[in-house]
Amino acid sequence: AANTSSSVLGNLKNGEKVTVLGKANGWAKINYQGKEGYVSLEFITIGKDSIDPTNPTNPGQVTEERAVVNASLLNVRKGPSTGAAAVGHLKNGETVTIIGKENGWAKIRFNGGEGYVSLQFLKVKQGSSSYEIVTSSQKVQKPNEAEATQIMQNMKEDAYIKSDGKVVNMKQGFVRANGVINIYDITTGKKLTYVKGGADLKFVKAVDDRIHVQIDGMTGYVNINDVTLHPTMTGEKTSYYATKNGKLYHYVYNPENGKHATYQIGNAPKHLKEGERYEAFDKKQIGGQDSYQYFEYMPLRATSTYTGDEIDNFLRKSNAKSPLIGLGKYFVSAAEKYKMNAGYLVSHAILESGWGTSRIAQDKKNLFGFRAVDSDPYNGATGFKTWEEGIDFCAAYIDKHYLNPSGNTYNGGNLGDKAQGMNVMYASDENWGQQIASLMYRIDAMNGSKDLNKYRLGTLTAGSPIFKSMAEGQTGMTSRNIMVAIKKTVNTPQGSYYEIVSDNKEYNSVYVKAGSVNLVNSY
């Protein structure tokens, strides 16, 4: 209460800032660690930009409006004029919070600060928004987002913020894609990757109307209108990993039917304990330690040892009615022609075509979903005259665009995930690479596990030089972090080098400095 006889909640140090919620009889009602308390007005100074709760017309009061960008690309500037320097840009459809207007310009919150955009390219939403902070024990209403965010962050208990019936910020939780959406680089705004509807991403923080997220160790942002925030305290289901009898299983949640679909990935990392559930936001660090599935992160130029007959035998035992039975020789032939792993090629075809039974596979002899875009898969898919033609064509395309370091969609020559490898741009399904790798594991297990962990895997650091041979100079340089398969170590007077499988099919092997590779544990 507002008197000296009330119990003490805590104390404030000289210079600390507080949010004043009200004033009466010489006392200020303030927010203190998520609760309300009182301090004497004689010991605080109210700044000129403060909100005066006793005077709603106080010019310091921030009245917020929400608006949607109505331009293909809208520059955000330091000041309210076209002569002011651009500090970033907004994409069409993004939502912004307007905190002021001046001469046809809107002052908005942007990247944790403020910026200006032309009002003519904004569509202002009708009505004013209020913000409700929700905890397990209370709900607090606030007139603007900044104040609500500050109060939530100061709370010791878990909390989230709702506005217009939608969660707009939270202390912890995950983010679910409302449809196929892009993830953007926080600094440049460049598209990093994309994910399918229903994909769950780890929540990092909300910065204005952009939500920072993580997937497979990569951080980027998504537009708040493209996702739904699920605070931990609401208990919404999501995907997870678990182990059983030494094997690792992925329980993938489907929000449309409320059920988990399960598949075995391969051997379980030794640090995981049976009976525990592990979050599924980073495939490489399940349980907080290295959990690289070998076939998912092995460069696909590492050839397999299987014959066409062995592939057919696997198909026959796994799915006796599969139309793919008898095509083993074509997968091996294409793999040899384009220097790629035959186990990968057939596993990719199995996943995309449903063991050869899909309508696209049956009608168009297209086993790889080539050109089967998310918006219209069947009509978009390319047709081929024979199975052999389809396999050869798609292998050539993958070789040129995804496995070749000079390819336009090269992100590392392995299946990978949403941070690196083919999965970055080949498919919106964030588990696409993992599912193909799980099939590769099954083929290998049926053939005596001859290829599993044949090479030690590592991450080659971006900018590292690559050498054609130990006798010749540098032949290239990595533009990004990539996975490598180490054949052997070569010690020289100049230092240690690794001979690695080359992503460039012109060479069987290339060499890199051992110090530029971070070794990882695979299973």
Put a short name on every predicted segment.
Residues 352:
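Pyridoxal 5′-phosphate
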Residues 15, 28-32, 93, 106-110, ...:
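SH3/SH3-like beta-barrel fold
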Residues 2-26, 78-101, 140-144, 185-197, ...:
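SH3/SH3-like (including bacterial SH3b) beta-barrel domains
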Residues 15, 21, 33, 41-42, ...:
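Tandem-repeat architecture and repeat-register "anchor" residues
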Residues 1-3, 69-80, 138, 181, ...:
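Short, solvent-exposed loop/edge segments of extracellular or virion-exposed proteins
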Residues 63, 127-344, 355-466, 472-482, ...:
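Catalytic cores of secreted/periplasmic lytic hydrolases that degrade extracellular macromolecules
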